[in-house]
Amino acid sequence: MDGTSNNCIMANVTEFENASDIKRLKFIVDALKESIPADGIVLDVGCGNGIISRGLGAQGFNVYGIDVSDKAIAKARQMNTYPNVRFDVINAEQLVADGKTYDGVVCSEVLEHLTDPSALLKVLYQSLKPEGRLIVTVPNGRGPRELFITKPTIALQKRNNWLWRAFKGLKSAMGYKGTTVQSDADDLTHLHFFTRKMLKKLAGESKFRIVRFGKTNFVENVFPFSLFAKRIKVLQKWDCQLAELLPIGFTGGFVSVWEKNKQ
């Protein structure tokens, strides 16, 4: 069965609608199926509204989704219909104090928002079983969206002048709510812009090594291409396929599998 067929199957069992999100979830599912036992437990860190946790639950995984946001967990619980998926409001310190270890840990689109990503990774190292796998996904800090959308937007926001107010008004008029399909957090600002080299360095400093790198999309979520891709779904699929043909530096996001460094 080819990747396109697998993505179509995945689309039928997830709340994600965007092709790159479905591709990201498929990477996570495949990586976990290859590395953890059938009755293993997966920790979803920074789970937000729980969309990934529920996607994993639909695949039969036992999932424990955690977030520091009461609002996020309340929504995650409200939307959850899977008996094998549960959610709690827990911070890193509580996770360590709990002392439990997990067969797999998912940290998807989280590290770029943290002041100190290495602090969380140290906690995840303690929370992962010796032969477990950590799945990390982050935007490519030098990818099209970060270069042409995220960084200019942050620079404009810092100026906080009439141009920023006009920009916010335009986004609002176009239906942009300032949230993502994965999170309704009040602040989704990117504090870090990871390159592949930076991510590998961060992994090493946290006593992990990256055993697999993958790509997400190219420009389907970059204005003005996003206007067309949002309405014409096949453009999203083509964009994800194009990302596979281009050098990894051109991808919009990195998907990766980490394991504990045995050296």
Where are these regions (language model features)?
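S-adenosyl-L-methionine-dependent methyltransferase catalytic module, highlighting the catalytic core
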Residues: C8, N12-I22, I51, V68, ...
